[in-house]
From Swiss-Prot:
One GO molecular-function entry: aspartic-type endopeptidase activity
Entry's cofactor comment: The RT polymerase active site binds 2 magnesium ions.
GO cellular component, one term: viral nucleocapsid
Residues given in the record as Zn(2+) binding sites: H1598, H1602, C1626, C1629
Cofactor: Mg(2+)
Segments of skewed composition (Acidic residues): 346-366
Lipid group attachment sites (N-myristoyl glycine): G2
Domain (Integrase catalytic): residue spans on this chain: 1643-1804
Region Disordered, residue ranges: 115-208, 323-376, 446-469, 1859-1880
Main function: Matrix protein p10: Matrix protein.
Biased composition (Basic and acidic residues): 446-459
EC number: 3.6.1.23, 3.4.23.-, 2.7.7.49, 2.7.7.7
Listed name of the protein: Gag-Pro-Pol polyprotein
Gene coding for it: pol
Amino acid sequence: MGQASSHSENDLFISHLKESLKVRRIRVRKKDLVSFFSFIFKTCPWFPQEGSIDSRVWGRVGDCLNDYYRVFGPETIPITTFNYYNLIRDVLTNQSDSPDIQRLCKEGHKILISHSRPPSRQAPVTITTSEKASSRPPSRAPSTCPSVAIDIGSHDTGQSSLYPNLATLTDPPIQSPHSRAHTPPQHLPLLANSKTLHNSGSQDDQLNPADQADLEEAAAQYNNPDWPQLTNTPALPPFRPPSYVSTAVPPVAVAAPVLHAPTSGVPGSPTAPNLPGVALAKPSGPIDETVSLLDGVKTLVTKLSDLALLPPAGVMAFPVTRSQGQVSSNTTGRASPHPDTHTIPEEEEADSGESDSEDDEEESSEPTEPTYTHSYKRLNLKTIEKIKTAVANYGPTAPFTVALVESLSERWLTPSDWFFLSRAALSGGDNILWKSEYEDISKQFAERTRVRPPPKDGPLKIPGASPYQNNDKQAQFPPGLLTQIQSAGLKAWKRLPQKGAATTSLAKIRQGPDESYSDFVSRLQETADRLFGSGESESSFVKHLAYENANPACQSAIRPFRQKELSTMSPLLWYCSAHAVGLAIGAALQNLAPAQLLEPRPAFAIIVTNPAIFQETAPKKIQPPTQLPTQPNAPQASLIKNLGPTTKCPRCKKGFHWASECRSRLDINGQPIIKQGNLEQGPAPGPHYRDELRGFTVHPPIPPANPCPPSNQPRRYVTDLWRATAGSAGLDLCTTTDTILTTQNSPLTLPVGIYGPLPPQTFGLILAEPALPSKGIQVLPGILDNDFEGEIHIILSTTKDLVTIPKGTRLAQIVILPLQQINSNFHKPYRGASAPGSSDVYWVQQISQQRPTLKLKLNGKLFSGILDTGADATVISYTHWPRNWPLTTVATHLRGIGQATNPQQSAQMLKWEDSEGNNGHITPYVLPNLPVNLWGRDILSQMKLVMCSPNDTVMTQMLSQGYLPGQGLGKNNQGITQPITITPKKDKTGLGFHQNLPRSRAIDIPVPHADKISWKITDPVWVDQWPLTYEKTLAAIALVQEQLAAGHIEPTNSPWNTPIFIIKKKSGSWRLLQDLRAVNKVMVPMGALQPGLPSPVAIPLNYHKIVIDLKDCFFTIPLHPEDRPYFAFSVPQINFQSPMPRYQWKVLPQGMANSPTLCQKFVAAAIAPVRSQWPEAYILHYMDDILLACDSAEAAKACYAHIISCLTSYGLKIAPDKVQVSEPFSYLGFELHHQQVFTPRVCLKTDHLKTLNDFQKLLGDIQWLRPYLKLPTSALVPLNNILKGDPNPLSVRALTPEAKQSLALINKAIQNQSVQQISYNLPLVLLLLPTPHTPTAVFWQPNGTDPTKNGSPLLWLHLPASPSKVLLTYPSLLAMLIIKGRYTGRQLFGRDPHSIIIPYTQDQLTWLLQTSDEWAIALSSFTGDIDNHYPSDPVIQFAKLHQFIFPKITKCAPIPQATLVFTDGSSNGIAAYVIDNQPISIKSPYLSAQLVELYAILQVFTVLAHQPFNLYTDSAYIAQSVPLLETVPFIKSSTNATPLFSKLQQLILNRQHPFFIGHLRAHLNLPGPLAEGNALADAATQIFPIISDPIHEATQAHTLHHLNAHTLRLLYKITREQARDIVKACKQCVVATPVPHLGVNPRGLVPNAIWQMDVTHFTPFGKQRFVHVTVDTFSGFILATPQTGEASKNVISHVIHCLATIGKPHTIKTDNGPGYTGKNFQDFCQKLQIKHVTGIPYNPQGQGVVERAHQTLKNALNRLARSPLGFSMQQPRNLLSHALFQLNFLQLDSQGRSAADRLWHPQTSQQHATVMWRDPLTSVWKGPDPVLIWGRGSACIYDQKEDGPRWLPERLIRHINNQTAPLCDRPSNPNTAPGPKGSP
């Protein structure tokens, strides 16, 4: 112990101490004791100089350890310190009378003497206990044991220097050896106990008052639950002396084992009152504190002896093996056995750790057989029934239920008992939860108790696992283990979910005005437990809400103590308890704790002025004190004896006495003093009235120098303020604290540090600083009275969400004005420090026997009614209702005292108006037999009436928050609905007194807002507001008023305007939206700042997370002030009753294109300081969702506090109910755990999959989940195939059997998903898995704790389902996957993979790098490892090697001695190949040269399937594509070559012989056999040895164009029957198609002579269903265009198209439609000189040609819609062009001419027939003239003389070829009669 100690002496002392402990069946190691005393010397440097170790000295050691624990924390103290201390303390106090201990005392005494001898060898000094007791304040009963004579060496460092806080807690510094008296040494035992102290002879058994107070304080802390115990050691067994000393020690009565509780809250506190284990005789002298408390705790000892040892939370087992002897049945203090109990010997766990020293070997020889017992009580079925009933009625975690379960702890329940109780009492779900929690807690206990290596079966005992599942074996567990089992069972039970849904928002739980603070905290903690889980009710977030949501009175009491570190909320409950509100406020005024306020101090005296309050609120035993209790022996007693007022009486101002004791009737000025009341009658108190709050009056300290200023600076008065200049009119006022002003806490009262009174005959006017309104701060003007002596306050409010006001900001000015007194009448003669102004006078209408009536006008008619706050709607009596006002019956019920079924209601909205001009609209009900009218809440709410209850408590709280009576409770400016618009004057800088005060200066408050938007144009955009319905108009007005009150919009005169519209939500409420499309077009888009979502797998592994959600993010971000006018809108008014109110947005509007970008930038700027200050934190931010992760929970909480502060400083609001602090976390659709990430575990439903759109959505959702699922692309192929086909989104689709199997695989992958977060300390591996169809990649990390265990996947990578090329080889796909993996690794994790695992060998990799550009690019600049050894993990074993890996059959060079083949193909469909100079030609079904040649190669592979060959082709595409087929996993189906490629691939994969394909350039006329062979193949394609089949060609032509039989017969020279059979075989053509008839309508004689034009509707064309059709009547050529309408502009567009196709007509004939008869079309025809004629109205026969063309065109469109050309109805122009091509160019007439031939080639070799004809007017025969057209019974004759056509009936026409006219028709003149040519 001394510095000169020898090693042998230390060993001797430690050996004796070990022997003493072994006597108590406690084994310790020597090195642990040496370490323990080394720490004692470090903590207590005075300990070696004491010279003796008795209970007093050892108690001082405990005090030092206790203080060391408080100052430096528990982590600085070894875990076994307090255990060893308690063991030695028990030896000192209980068993020191044994011979063994006596021998140890002697040896320790000798060692201490030798160790404490100073180097100078001076004579020893004797210091008795009495001398020490006289030199220090006794902290406990002094010891009477004389100390050992010791020599005190030099002590360089005193205790006060090392521990300044302990100087006053322990003994004074020890005197030097030279200053002490030398007395002979007295040798006594080194270790003394209480028995020796009792017989020491001292008679001083009384404690002084100071020590008695300390003792009471220590006793009050006897069982402090705030400090969990560190040890879980069972109670010490009764002492049984060893056999070698049993004869020398008399038997003693031993008490039952008890649990020693700490006194000071420190775990294992050494100063815990020791309950004696030895029956002591009655003390005859003074004893220590333990003996003094013996009588007081005698009852407690008896109770504690029967209690079970229940360790608190967080227990740690003491690492000392203890064996306990058998307890006799007659042991004192042992309770009698229970009928259901039996004694079972307990076995002791053997220490499995091997000894590493001689000391361990010596201890191992001790017997370890079980030698102690405990009582085991079986479970009682009645008890289980009670618990089951409590669980069913109250819930498993109700206090009553938990108390019943805790009552079972004395039965030493085994794990089997706990499992039986859980099954019997809990529900199925709760039973599973309890088992899970119990197993987890058991594992934790097993880990915590592992100090030495535990036995192999130790962790199995607590959960009762095999082989300890038998209840008999469990009952034999030692007491310490059973104690842990009880603790684990109770903990698991208490962690069960509470009864009730955890849906209550914490932010909505607020303390009521009359609600006690303890009830409010109880509700808050209960809700927190439901939301966050058990144990989180004391979190910092809940403590924060405990202040923020408290009522104003409690907030005032808590505010001074918020910055203190409080472990629990117990101090807050003390501050705000109902009977101590006055104490808390008094303490807050002096910055003291309430406990300090009650101590004898010279600063305060609390006088009760209203004892009735104590009679109402305090318990009956508490008497109202009249002054503070004082101690007569306290050093400050003299100051408190004569405590009195230090200021003059505020009543008379003439003497120093209390106002309550003032007897004067006149004040100092001779004025009479008006009697003051106690608020029974008279005016209400002012807003700052706090003098008599709850009956306490807080007086200033003695002497009252300056009680109000917070520092030692003198008080500053208004007269001390400096003016800026000589001409300044006002004095500036600045804030004295840093303040955050929000709309929730405004109006806010702030002190300015300036006090009254004002100069005589003056008063002050407080005005706002002119520059403040521009920053959103409003200062309410006020009046400062001349006689006000308190501190001046200013009242602030804000129109913004959040404004920060730094300390020293200039806020207001006070202008001093002269005071003019009108009369001498006043309410109070003296104001003092009460509220300034006359705000303590207000008017209310008190409730009396008379009914509160109100007169209102409804549509101008006066009505009188009663104010009914219980009525939902206004009801008018039928007798008062005007008869001419309409009524309607409504299907509802009115319920009150009676009931009215289907009452009548006003059929129109009525406008109400009061006498003050306020108005609104209501729809009242009308009831008969109603005596009076009732004004319901529908009209009272519009009038903004307020119910005021003048309760003293409520009124005091309201007044303390600045409420002005009589002005309402409005949020803005005390009841004013609209804020006062203040026009700032920028040229006014104020008085500037801050220029002379360096500590007080004006600081510009930055107002954060969004970035400015760039605009393309500066001209205003105005879009008129469209009208709204009456219902939506009222909703729009209400919503606009709501946004205006919230500060989101403001009135404006902006030249910009865009319309608003109102939609109804599903909930029935309305939503305001603005159409900003026109504004978005003229603004410059900012672009996306985050192209994708952040991946949660990049969060570091094992980081603690907190998720934050911002509330109404857009509405909390202010727009740039210059951008606000661009987002203006107008509120429509019905019938233009008034000008439309116009507003503009002050915050980010919804629907603006740049709002998401501005929101992201604003939030990112808010959290930028957090990122810079916390670089080790991982913060994810996306829009309004923020996730922060730190490596420890403490860092996460600190970072959370910082980020909340930063967000709040920017005005952003946090949604408290969406803050997530515990697992599982929900973020961006993911479920985050401590290590793993899960996507939503959904089950894919198939009942709704019916259309293409449904399957497209399903596959889109699956693609979003795939990066986190083990789902290869091959599993999605059947689902992807369903998407092929008809592109119509509503086209019908159905699940195939293969698709159903794919969905099953997908559901399985979703349920078995397992993706882990990354560990940046482990290597990142990219695995390329050769899965079928396409390869798959995964980011992988090995197991960080055990490399032999399986690793974890981080992210799965997949290639797109539709590749960019038709043929992609497997090596190319792997290269693409490597590129994607490296890109993703840099994007998400910021690094390249450490290694890449590929399915190729090193030789194959070398070959790929040499021959493949994709692999060279993929591995460019990669510095990691490339390997082909996959980890042996079952997760990746599903990816077996696939056959499409490396080419085997395809060769890159010609094959020696192989067959030489040449191929070629032509567009005529002939395929040719040459084998051994023998050409072979084949007719292919294709007309593309590439497909024909591919067909030839397919024939070659079929013919030469069993021999190698070298093939040459002149197609480079074929030469490059075919060699790839061997390694192509799948072929893209978007090309016509896909079927040929698929067949070739199957032939190649089935081949056994290699092949080579080379490329030759054709038509170069080069010499050599290769060129000759290629030329021979080319020539073979030009020979057509096979006779073509005209029927086949006709069939193909009909398939493409659906030609009629007549045209097929003429074009392909087939018979009529063959043509008709082809048409009949077509399912889409009508068999009985009528033959086109020429008709009898007038037709043009030449092309473009007459057009007929009309419009037909073809519905399948959709919007372009208006098909304009034009027919040339001469040739029958049809032109048509799809249009979107029939207006003149559409007609003109069609005519322009026709003019560009066939030229300009002479005449256009149409019907009388408005599109044709309109002025626009008439002008168009006139300008182009086109004659326009119309037919007879409503007679379509005049348009017969074009009408028949309509039907012909529609039939052709319907047939061609399914043509192989692939034109559908969604392509109107293409399909229409195809139909016109078929009608105009492919349809032939009887002469084999098409309409195009007739149009462009009107002259033919055929001669017109010449006839003679008789003029019907003159009966004269004329001619011969040609016949132009033969009709039905008529003909058109061309009169060559008249040069024009003439229609004649057939009877007037005669052919001149061998025919003459009838005789009856011959003319009289034979010279003119027609006859044969050449006849006379």
